[in-house]
Design a protein with these regions (language model features):
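Conserved ATP-driven motor cores of ASCE-family P-loop NTPases powering translocation/secretion/packaging/pilus
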Residues: 183-185, 189-286
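Intrinsically disordered, low-complexity segments enriched in serine, threonine, and glycine
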Residues: 294-296
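P-loop NTPase motor domains
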Residues: 1-191, 206-207, 273-277, 285-292, ...
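A generic structural motif
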Residues: 159-163, 195-198, 246-254, 310-318
Length: 383
């Protein structure tokens, strides 16, 4: 789901539709197959993409040879055996077209190998993981980032782990499946979630109305600079109202009368939020049983201690180099290594197809179960 919904944001609110679920199910079947095949040594996203682009007659034959995958492929097999070629081609194209945008030697390099595990709050192997997007390829890389995020969430949201934080800036640039559940449940597992974005309307546009509302209403702490429109109104309503006194003075020829009344007014009006100066923020914070905060709502200027920041920056340690992509003579071989890895993945995918088709052809019982003919009486391949 994470991969396909990041590549097709319009599908987020169409989950359950036939032509939305079909490509998701097909990709899931391929990934599950790669997990089964040879104990998962080829279970990577690039290998899944390459297999998806192989002839569907070979792919479906191989996948259906595994009983645990038959139910995944039922919609495709019905169309294939019923000669509904237009429907079948549409189902397959719905998966192929978005995923082919992710075919890239650089992306394949990053998404293969076993450099480290993603359980960042493992007490035995704690880690800091920092990933970034590329504005030029935002729609493509957001799928990869979303995949990593969804996997990390499942690994870190457990008991008996170190406390950790998931910090995401420009949240709408990626679709983070399960984010609402993470916010709601992770606190008990010492996981803090920090989300940064420009405006609520961005979140609604990219996550859909329902999911956006859940995220907005689940967070306990909120900090906001200058925002306008519906976002300012929403924040003003969230901060609530306060009973305020109002004095009115009436003057006529004979006397002056003064009246004082009280009424509920917005604690921080939307107009004030829309005109905040740089460095000035409004917000609300949550407290704990043993750490009560009387004034939870604030409107203040954040004073930055530049001296402390400078001292902290001077104490930074350089990030160690894991791979400098140089040969023994100091020559840069980055592109050669990346291209070699790309070619190897393609070769792996073709080798899987060849080996599996040979296995099926040499197994008469399996051939019969799959309804395959003996290829005009040819003997099984002994190679």
């Amino acid at each position: 789901y994470t991969i396909m919904l990041n590549l097709n944001r319009t599908w987020i609110e169409k989950q359950g539709d036939f032509f939305v679920e079909s490509p998701i199910i097909l990709l899931a079947a391929i990934i599950w197959y790669l997990k089964i095949y040879k104990n998962g040594i080829y279970c990577t996203f690039p290998h899944a993409v390459e297999l998806l682009n192989k002839p569907y007659s070979d792919l479906f034959t191989i996948l259906t040879s595994y009983p645990e995958l038959e139910n995944y492929l039922s919609p495709f097999m019905d169309a294939w055996k019923g000669n509904a070629q237009d429907q079948l081609q549409g189902q397959i194209a719905s998966a192929k077209i978005p995923l082919t945008r992710m075919i890239s030697p650089q992306l394949y390099w990053v998404m293969t190998g076993n450099d480290f595990s993603l359980d960042i709050n493992n007490p035995k192997e704690p880690k800091l993981l920092c990933v970034g997007n590329n504005p030029d390829r935002q729609n493509i890389y957001s799928a990869a980032l979303g995949l990593y995020n969804s996997r990390i969430v499942k690994l870190i949201n457990k008991k008996k782990q170190l406390k950790c934080a998931v910090i995401i800036d420009e949240l709408p640039t990626i679709y983070f499946r399960g984010l609402d559940n993470l916010i709601a449940t992770a606190r008990s597992n010492k996981v803090g979630v920090l989300l940064g974005f420009q405006d609520f309307s961005q979140l609604t546009r990219d996550y859909g109305e329902k999911e956006s509302k859940v995220i907005q209403n689940t967070v306990g702490n909120i900090f906001s600079g200058q925002v306008v429109g519906e976002t300012a109104k929403t924040l003003s309503e969230r901060f609530g109202k306060v009973l305020q006194q109002r004095q009115s003075v009436s003057i006529n020829r004979q006397d002056v009368s003064t009246s004082i009344n009280t009424q509920l007014d917005s604690l921080i009006p939307a107009s004030k939020i829309a005109n905040l100066s740089q460095g000035t923020f409004v917000g609300a914070v949550a407290d704990n049983f043993d750490e009560r905060i009387e004034q939870k709502i604030f409107h203040a200027e954040i004073v930055v201690d530049h001296t402390k920041i400078s001292a902290e920056e001077k104490a930074y340690q350089k990030i160690p180099v894991i791979n400098d992509f140089k040969d023994r003579n100091g020559n840069d071989i980055m592109m050669q290594q990346i291209q070699r890895n790309y070619d190897q993945i393609k070769a792996d995918a073709q080798a899987i197809i060849n080996e599996e088709m040979r296995r099926i052809k040499n197994d008469p019982e399996l051939r019969k179960r799959l309804g395959l003919e003996d290829e005009k009486g040819k003997k099984p391949d002994k190679s």
